[in-house]
A protein has these predicted regions:
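A conserved amphipathic helix/loop scaffold
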Residues: 82-288
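Aromatic-lined carbohydrate-recognition surfaces of secreted/lumenal glycan-active proteins
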Residues: 24-29, 64, 106-108
Length: 288
């Protein structure tokens, strides 16, 4: 099996349309914060990566104490503690939002200030949870454990999802030219420890949470697929702007013939063959 894997990888490299694959497009910055141990940091980052991939976009990672890279979307998963993000770092992110970016934050037991003026909700009280939150989002119910419950009162936010008693847990608000989104539950940390969360058909559509705030970056991709188990990377090359190399990967245990949605003005150079289980194939998009 090892020798076959090496042969298959050699065949994959030989099939690439270019000897040197350009770097792939990254659409968002995932910010890793303080007050998390190694497992928590890895879990939050891993889930953020997978939720992004299943929605058809890619992330780059950076630590919160680094200068924030310019991006249309910032993802801050599983914020913990009072010092998970320092005030000046938080304000620096908000400046990016004022300029037009989108900021998504999910909370573990983290605290943010300012809060109400940014997110459009007021915290009336905070209490320890004795049972997981049952969240109604669209036509699905999502069950998520969390150490605390924030009892929120809406002021100017849009409520995207709420608990069964109406308490908002996922909200969106305008801030300057951009948008802020807040999830008061540790989505990413929980999913990382939930067997089958990303592929079992019995699981709800967890990627819906990321799709709610990432539509603007997803819409900019040249190729998309509705299958969460087929992931894509785009490798634009400034030297040949009329072409874009792409790679599709089948992350399932069965063969898949992927169906793509191609951006206006582009087309497949040739049809992609059926993808074998747990394998990938390169293809090229060309301008019409």
């Amino acid at each position: 099996p090892i020798a076959k894997t090496f042969r298959d990888f050699r065949a994959f490299l030989d099939a690439l349309p270019s000897a040197n694959l350009p770097p792939f497009r990254r659409d968002a910055v995932c910010v890793l914060t303080r007050e998390q141990n190694f497992d928590q940091t890895m879990s939050n980052g891993w889930s953020a990566f997978l939720l992004a991939k299943q929605n058809g976009f890619d992330v780059r990672f950076q630590y919160v104490n680094e200068t924030f890279e310019k991006s249309d979307l910032y993802i801050v998963p599983g914020l913990r503690g009072a010092c998970g993000i320092f005030r000046e770092e938080y304000l620096a992110l908000l400046e990016r939002v004022k300029e037009g970016a989108t900021l998504y934050i999910s909370l573990d037991d983290g605290a943010l200030s300012p809060f109400e003026s940014i997110f459009g909700v007021e915290v009336e009280s905070r209490e320890a949870r004795t049972a997981p939150a049952r969240v109604k989002f669209g036509n699905e119910t999502f069950i998520l454990p969390s150490p605390f419950r924030l009892n929120l009162r809406k002021t100017h936010a849009e409520v995207l999802a709420a608990e069964e008693d109406g308490n908002p847990v996922f909200i969106r608000a305008k801030y300057g030219k951009g948008t802020v989104c807040l999830l008061t539950l540790p989505l990413e940390l929980d999913l990382a420890g939930r067997p089958g969360a990303f592929h079992k058909t019995s699981e709800p559509e967890w990627r819906r949470f990321y799709r709610a705030f990432a539509q603007h970056v997803i819409a900019k991709r040249l190729v998309r697929t509705g299958n969460p188990l087929v992931t894509l990377t785009e490798h634009p090359d400034a030297a040949t702007p009329e072409r874009c190399l792409c790679v599709a990967v089948n992350n399932s245990a069965v063969p898949i013939r992927p169906e793509f949605e191609i951006a206006d003005g582009w087309k497949l150079e040739k049809e992609l063959p059926e993808l074998a289980p747990f394998s990938g194939a390169p293809f090229r998009l060309i301008k019409k």
